[in-house]
Amino acid sequence: MAKQEQAPDRANDVFALTSFLYGGNADYIEELYAKYEDDPNSVDPQWRDFFAKLGDNADDVKKNAEGPSWTRKNWPIAANGELVSALDGNWAEVEKHVTDKLKGKAAKGEAKGAAGTPLTAEEITQAARDSVRAIMMIRAYRMRGHLHANLDPLGLAEKPNDYNELEPENYGFTPADYNRKIFIDNVLGLEYATVPEMLDILKRTYCGAIGVEFMHISDPAEKAWIQERIEGPDKKVAFTPEGKKAILSKLIEAEGFEQFIDVKYKGTKRFGLDGGESLIPALEQIVKRGGQMGLKEVVLGMAHRGRLNVLSQVMGKPHRAIFHEFKGGSYTPDDVEGSGDVKYHLGASSDREFDGNKVHLSLTANPSHLEIVNPVVMGKARAKQDLLVGRTRDDMVPLSERPKVLPLLLHGDAAFAGQGVVAECLGLSGLKGHRVAGTLHFIINNQIGFTTNPAFSRSSPYPSDVAKMIEAPIFHVNGDDPEAVVFAAKVATEFRMTFHKPVVIDMFCYRRFGHNEGDEPSFTQPLMYKAIRAHKTTVQLYGEKLIAEGLVTQDDIDRMKADWRQKLEGEFEAGQSYKPNKADWLDGAWAGLRTADNADEQRRGKTAVPVKTLKEIGKKLVEVPKDFHVHRTIQRFLDNRAKMMETGEGIDWATAESLAFGSLAVEGHPIRLSGQDVERGTFSQRHTVLYDQENQNRYIPLNNLQKGQAIYEAINSMLSEEAVLGYEYGYSLSDPRALVLWEAQFGDFANGAQVVFDQFISSGERKWLRMSGLVCLLPHGFEGQGPEHSSARLERYLQLCAEDNMQVANVTTPANYFHILRRQMKRDFRKPLIMMTPKSLLRHKRAISTLAELSGESSFHRLLWDDAQYNKDEGIKLQKDAKIRRVVLCSGKVYYDLYEEREKRGIDDVYLLRVEQLYPFPAKALINELSRFRHAEMVWCQEEPKNMGAWSFIDPYLEWVLAHIDAKHQRVRYAGRPAAASPATGLMSKHLAQLAAFLEDALG
């Protein structure tokens, strides 16, 4: 027994001896072993013994050194550049490197000992140790210096206890060593430096008014760029006298604006920027520096804090317009309809010019739901980037073309740390289908969330810590040092324009008043507000600094303030009689579109496509390149589709969709379809992107229809609903001529994005005069798949419907699906479309259409007749209208359940009428149809429970219609599942029993 126990011990001993052979040391060991093979005396005696004892052949040692075959190649990323390995803690390598360099210098006579003679071996070793310890200290500052930076203007933040890890003593340096020049190989822009010289640069760079976090970045080029940009004796925060005066001027404007409103509208909510005024010159710098580096457009998104100040001082919105709104006036002309919104939610756009570079700015309108505007801004920016390249591009726009449009997001500290959509947007930032060449995030960190202290609103030291997951550099900066804030904004902009990646500025400031101007903050933060009341404003502090520098006098500052106040007084007077001259919502890309009128007109648009064109598109849909290896199941799918095109019969759901997409692309409308697994389709029905089975190359038939067509993009999104839907909504705001679709994996999961439906899609047009043609495809249908795979909660969307705000449809034929998709682009206005889409109907033998139904004079039908009325070869022949005893109205898949059950029972006096579009409700069309059956009993049948589905919505509408036609039965009877808390049962037996019960109720 004892013998058997020895084996693991021996194995452990061997592992202990050889563990250094694994992973990252492989190259080094290989190199040593190769040297040993050539000449055993060329390596250290310990290594010589080790290699001799191994007695392995060279290949085995090499294999061991390389580690397992599944190890990720090129990872960890190899450090490149001088001494970068030191900064990642590979000290043995550094010591060797420095020793070699010092030996070389000694040999050339460049490095001298204390007596001025060439260095001895002992002195070289000491000098190398000094260098390594100095570099360890430099690394500590780069890693942890931000924790010691002077960031809090109020000085209330506790200093971290880091056990003096930044002190020279920690690295073996005593004051006696302070005069000695140490070789640091240009790490801080110096070849040699004393400890005090190093500390001077390090403290100024990492522990001043700016604290930089960048050592979590794994890309050596990005890391080296930041070091190069901020480290060194000549890299101080420095501005010209003109630059300093410009900063002062912007601060005076920002502070003066808030104070002016405070006097004129005492106690009115404005969510002032008081305490964070440095934001304004920082934003100016972002636009200015960006413009110099090729930036053409900035899409802003921000919360309420400081919004009016940004609108007026950065966006150039006339002050008179803002004062008009404070007075209670509308921001649109009187003849423009809309419910409006509070002034600190409104958007705006303008052009700014710096140094001859014109940059267009647009601020996106947003609700009070914090951070939800972020994905909308990113989507808008993506669409604008795409439009710069053109709609007929033949591939996704490369990343190098995207930096011309910058998404710029302003955040509150508590919201950035608290809202999940922030992490979702960061997750989108690097994905090919959603990247925007880097968003610039600016956190207005007033160190409080309404009344909650940071310790209770986040678990991490900084609000920005969530951004570390995507390795974004983070610049923490003291808001009371405007020059530092502007410098941080400049470097952040340069990083984004250089590397096309997100970057974060975290400006520590404070909120001089309460959460809003009617709030008393001392109830909950007495000490903080005591400090704030005693604290000078940023303008006072910066003014004193410039006076001390002799740049301005107090009289100059007083005059600047008086001039600004006079300008605001003039604007205030003008605001009393101000009239907005036009609504801006149909400018730019939206030119040529109009607002929709009468909700009940047909508004079909010309959606039919000639059969010849459809067949040409269909032919291309089933063609693949000769050398492309298609999966055999997909080949069968393509063969079936080719047969449909040949005969013009049996067009299924996915084929109708591809024909709609293809015909729109040929007509110049780009298609952007996004969502989880949309390339293939959740139910393996779509297959618009084909994969070669031998090399995984992609082929997209829809992008190979004809020259000059618009692009089709199918984007398998990340596993998120909220950010992705918000993003696609934003995209639809910027390009009205692109068909933008978001598909939920199942409709049940769409409520993960409920905020986007409630705050943007259903109400954006009425609140902010912003139209959208976004299509939401929500798979819906009760098939025994349980409570989370049955219901898109149709009732929720219907409850949101009013004032012709959007369309809700539940269509049953591929032809109607084809027309409703094309209708989105073929009218001169835009409305969102919420569609319940099928699952089992995707392959249902009856849910098919013909090419004839997509062409000629065909169009979308809001109501569809009973198939038995027209199809002579159907199983039953219906009675004449006068003999029909009951009309069963329904919507969606349940029609086919009713149809088959009726056929099975041989019933011929029950008429099935489908309501394909539930909103806008087709009242006139229903009056026409139901007039045929005035005498009949009316039933509404649905598969959803009674408290769900369309019943509650449609019941009053149907009652109105029946009264209008003077029907015999003035009330509609309900047939469907009884009310339920959960949408559907998870038991197939129960599902079938419920189905049988309501079919009996409807048809019996």
From Swiss-Prot:
Keyword field contains Oxidoreductase: yes
Cofactor requirement: thiamine diphosphate
Keywords: Glycolysis, Oxidoreductase, Thiamine pyrophosphate
GO MF terms, alphabetically ordered: oxoglutarate dehydrogenase (succinyl-transferring) activity; thiamine pyrophosphate binding
Residue stretches spanning the membrane: none
The reaction(s) this protein catalyses: N(6)-[(R)-lipoyl]-L-lysyl-[protein] + 2-oxoglutarate + H(+) = N(6)-[(R)-S(8)-succinyldihydrolipoyl]-L-lysyl-[protein] + CO2
InterPro entries the UniProt entry points to: 2-oxogl_dehyd_N, 2oxoglutarate_DH_E1, 2oxoglutarate_DH_E1_bac, DH_E1, KGD_C_sf, ODO-1/KGD_C, THDP-binding, Transketolase-like_Pyr-bd
GO BP of this protein: glycolytic process; tricarboxylic acid cycle
GO CC annotations on file: cytosol; oxoglutarate dehydrogenase complex
Domain of life: Bacteria
Enzyme class: oxidoreductase
Alphabetized PANTHER family for the sequence: 2-OXOADIPATE DEHYDROGENASE COMPLEX COMPONENT E1, 2-OXOGLUTARATE DEHYDROGENASE
The protein's role, per its UniProt record: E1 component of the 2-oxoglutarate dehydrogenase (OGDH) complex which catalyzes the decarboxylation of 2-oxoglutarate, the first step in the conversion of 2-oxoglutarate to succinyl-CoA and CO(2).
Family label: Belongs to the alpha-ketoglutarate dehydrogenase family.
Subunit structure: Homodimer. Part of the 2-oxoglutarate dehydrogenase (OGDH) complex composed of E1 (2-oxoglutarate dehydrogenase), E2 (dihydrolipoamide succinyltransferase) and E3 (dihydrolipoamide dehydrogenase); the complex contains multiple copies of the three enzymatic components (E1, E2 and E3).
UniProt name for this protein: 2-oxoglutarate dehydrogenase E1 component
Organism: Brucella suis (strain ATCC 23445 / NCTC 10510)
